[in-house]
Amino acid sequence: MRQESMKKAFSNRRMEGLSAQAVCLALRGVALRGVVLRGAVLSGVVPVGLALLGLALLGAVPLRAQISLATVVDLAQQNSSSVKLAEADTRKARAILTEMNDVYIPNLDIGSSIGPPTIGFPAGQPSIANATMSSLVFSFSQGFYIKAARAAYKAASLALKDAREQTALDASTTYIELDTVERERDEASQQQTDANRLEEIEQARAEAGVDSHSDLLQSRLTLAELHLKQLHLASRAAVLRAELASMTGLPVASIHPLHSSIPAIPAVTGQATGQATETPGLAAANASAQSRLMQAKGDAQVNHRPLITFGAQYNRDSNSLNNYSTYYQHFKADNFSIGVTIQIPIFDLIHRDKARESAADALRTRVEAEQASRQNDLQIATLDASLGELSALTDIAQLKQEIAHEQLKEVQSELQYGNGSSADPGASPQVTPKALQLALIDEQSKAMDAAESEFDLCKARLSLLRALGHMEDWLKTLGPATLVGQPTGQPTATAIPSPAP
């Protein structure tokens, strides 16, 4: 029953593709066979003229491409600034982790100290070429620093996943809302036609003295209110298209939703499982807190613990550039040294203060992670409580739509066959065309209310999926990105499917 009422709203869209096909087939037949007009076979000018006329009619048909929800989500994630920033943070965290591990690998530097001879005692080695190597051998703090960098990289990766899910949620919600508004605009357009017909009927009845002038004014008020509703829906659709264009980078005029690409949204509840939920955002906060904790432990291990480093140096010296032989009897050209350095900080107030600072940062990030977890639990409870109310409102709106549809069928039947009552004074009055137009307008209003209630329910369900950490599971049901039809201005005969009941 609901599907029948929704099909009427999309009849104009489906006729676009069918009209294009009919014109193409007619033109093909005219071009091949010619036209017989008044007994004369016209095979020259008339087929060409009709072909040009048909092409003009075909160009007037508003053909457009439709973009699937999967395409919108994919483009939004690629174009999102928050996702790009999260990707940059992930690459930075990965580089820091690599840096923490590479301190154990000796580095190699080469250089030269060529210059004129010094005056008096030589101030430096007359080095033609030199090479130095150094690395960390052992540190009590470095192990904690590596763990901190690994946890920070995990936090950045989870934050990237969280940013992608949030972008997908925003794009999906906007896309579904635009699809709902487009369906409501179709209903409003039909309402406008019925309201115009109602005004014509009231005008005739008022002129005939059947209805009062106030009834005519009421019909005009209804027409004005429906016109205002159309303007509101048009502006709302324009804003939603602009939002999707900003998210995806697509032209505004190319964004037309494909209703069949929207998968069903599962009716989950916050009490479905008694286990604690952890979204990518919460997991990222916990990983960040763990990273700060490891950083604080590493800073606390600096004082009173040995630090061992490795070093090696080679010099190729020359006496012709300096007067080394005057002061050093056993001067050699090639010199090499290697060894380790052991340092034990006994009294270092700077590192002690740094450890206290890191401990405070670790405590702060831990409290922030716990606060985010509590806020997420509160959001789940709020959404779970509102879902029951929204579901009930959706059921009521659908029942009202079904009742209005049944009442419309009754009016149509009585208008066609009569209500079976006599012309007695106490008998029920016969149904008039005015009642039919009012029933049509009411049925379309109830259909729009039902579509709006269903969108509110879908939006709440998506938000709950996100809060429960199941957003990725729903995104997997979107399927591949698709583009149905061709851009506006390119002829095509793609039919627009009917919406799901």
Residue ranges and their predicted role:
Residues 417, 421-428, 442-501:
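Acidic, low-complexity, intrinsically disordered peripheral segments
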Residues 84-88, 101-105, 137-164, 214, ...:
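Sec/SRP-type N-terminal targeting helices
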Residues 8, 166-283, 383-390, 410, ...:
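Periplasmic alpha-helical coiled-coil/stalk elements that build and connect Gram-negative outer-membrane
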Residues 26, 31, 36, 40-60:
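Bacterial N-terminal signal peptides
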Residues 1-39:
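N-terminal secretory signal peptides that target proteins for export/translocation
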Residues 71-138, 250, 274-354, 378, ...:
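A small-residue-enriched
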Residues 61-65:
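Sec/Tat signal peptide C-region and signal peptidase I cleavage site
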